[in-house]
């Protein structure tokens, strides 16, 4: 999300939109989620490249561009979530606690397939 969406992003999102619409037509319950990953080093680099001091201001502006792009393309997403939102953090923390509580986080040595 370190820059404006390009045709590749539009292609992938349009393909997902087609699938969501098709499955809705078939009567399936569909929850189509889109969003932006704002917790990346590339966002920091892009903000600095654009002489931005506040990284959050930069990702706020870029996220708005992405949301507007999907609106202009009439993407039928049910929700747009940003990784800097508290509701995302809460979900991620819940996931990692569940994984840890099941004992699925451990130190080891990778042995290959």
State the predicted function of each range:
Residues 1-113:
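N-terminal, positively charged nucleic-acid-binding surface of large information/translation enzymes
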